From Swiss-Prot:
GO terms for biological process: actin polymerization or depolymerization; defense response; inflorescence development; lateral root development; leaf development. Binds to actin monomers and regulates the organization of the actin cytoskeleton. At high concentrations, profilin prevents the polymerization of actin, whereas it enhances it at low concentrations. At low concentrations, associates with the poly-proline motif of formins to enhance actin filament elongation rate. Binds G-actin and poly-L-proline with low affinity in vitro. Binds ACT1, ACT7 and ACT11 and inhibits actin polymerization. May be involved in the cross-talk between vesicular trafficking and the actin cytoskeleton. Inhibits cell growth of various pathogenic fungal strains. PANTHER family: PROFILIN, PROFILIN-1-RELATED. It holds the Pfam family Profilin. This is Profilin-2.
Amino acid sequence: MSWQSYVDDHLMCEVEGNHLTHAAIFGQDGSVWAQSSAFPQLKPAEIAGINKDFEEAGHLAPTGLFLGGEKYMVVQGEAGAVIRGKKGPGGVTIKKTTQALVFGIYDEPMTGGQCNLVVERLGDYLIESGL
C-alpha cells in the first residue's frame, strides 16, 4: 500500500459522518511521505520543535505548536508518543511512530476525540508494522 493510500483511506476516512480537514505522514526528518491536498507547508523549525517535544515533553507548551505558521495551544498528550493541539473549534493530533510523524488536523463538527482515534489507530498500526 502506498503512503498516499494511508492518508486517503485511513486518515481522511469518514468517522461518524465527519472527516479530518487535513492529514499527512512525514518522516521524522521532515520529509513528506504523503499528504492531503492543502496540508500546511511545514517549516524545518516547526518539525524540529515537534521532534524536541517528543524528546522532552512540555517543550512546546510555553510557545505553542506551529504548523505552517498557524499557532496551536498544546493540550495534554502522551509523552514521547502523541502531541495534541487546540486552535479555536479545531485542533491537531500528531502521533510519533518508529520512523514517521502522523498528522491529523480537524475542525468542527469533528471532535478532538475522533481525530485522536483516527490518527492514533494508524500510528499504532505503523508501529506494530515496524514503521
